[in-house]
């Protein structure tokens, strides 16, 4: 929980204007990557337990994911990033983002520290995945 609070605060700052709007995705990915690298043991535990751990731990991890989703949805609503979408749809979009972030954690944690090219390719790929989510969100029409 403690690590989640810090990471959510860092990412919230990125979304709320500390960075240029066009750089928010890349800056958020870099913040996330740096945070994972600084907290490898915790995230290795989270990634492993998220799908194979005890039910109590999985529930705690899901609760943190829900906090991320709700906060991000509120920020997107406040920023008008994807106008005209319901709260339910915003939370669906944010759920895709959080799932993508957590799925990328293993790849980030497995990166050798001396392979800058691989690191750049991974960051670029992760940014492209998030960009695709938001491009789709902008085109989404409520049923």
Regions found by a protein language model. Give the residues of each.
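Amphipathic alpha-helical packing segments from all-alpha helical-bundle domains
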Residues: 2-9, 35, 55-81, 91-106, ...
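Transmembrane helix-loop junctions in multipass membrane proteins, especially transporters and channels
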Residues: 82, 111-115
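Short helix-capping/turn signature of helix-turn-helix
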Residues: 48-53
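Short, structured loop/turn "capping" segments at alpha-beta junctions
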Residues: 39, 43-44, 72
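C-terminal effector-binding regulatory domain of bacterial HTH transcription factors
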Residues: 137-143
